[in-house]
């Protein structure tokens, strides 16, 4: 689409093709020290999981060594990782939380 001004200048509107943001999955990693109930609490508080879903993810972390908490744009995933790590440290647990590009 072109816009012509009185002074003769012509502005051309250039179509922008926006791609969706890169998505990242947030993972909890298993360790031998963090209580299972604390992992369930983290999943409920920071990932809005109901108790049953949080328990299923916690069991996956325990059984498989890691569990997916959710998939988010980079900034949100990064913030969630930081919040979980800070909460775990303050509670004295070595729980690890990481993000991976999907």
UniProtKB/Swiss-Prot annotation:
Q: Which domain of life is it from?
A: Bacteria
Coiled-coil boundaries: none
Q: Which GO terms describe its biological process?
A: protein catabolic process; proteolysis
InterPro entries hit by this protein: ClpS (IPR022935), ClpS_core (IPR003769), Ribosomal_bL12_C/ClpS-like (IPR014719)
Stretch forming the signal peptide? none
Q: Function, please? A: Involved in the modulation of the specificity of the ClpAP-mediated ATP-dependent protein degradation.
UniProt record similarity statement = Belongs to the ClpS family.
Task: Fill in the subunit field for this protein.
Answer: Binds to the N-terminal domain of the chaperone ClpA.
Q: Which protein are we looking at?
A: ATP-dependent Clp protease adapter protein ClpS
Highest classification ranks of the organism: Bacteria, Pseudomonadati, Pseudomonadota, Betaproteobacteria, Burkholderiales
């Amino acid at each position: 689409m072109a816009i012509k001004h009185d002074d003769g200048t012509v502005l051309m509107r250039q179509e922008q093709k926006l791609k969706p943001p890169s998505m990242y999955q947030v993972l909890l990693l298993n360790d031998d020290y963090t209580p299972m109930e604390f992992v369930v609490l983290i999943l409920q508080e920071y990932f809005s999981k109901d108790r049953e879903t949080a328990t299923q993810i916690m069991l996956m972390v325990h059984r498989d060594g890691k569990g997916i908490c959710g998939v988010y744009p980079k900034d949100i995933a990064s913030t969630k990782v930081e919040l979980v790590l800070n909460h775990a440290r303050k509670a004295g647990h070595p729980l690890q939380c990481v993000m991976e590009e999907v």
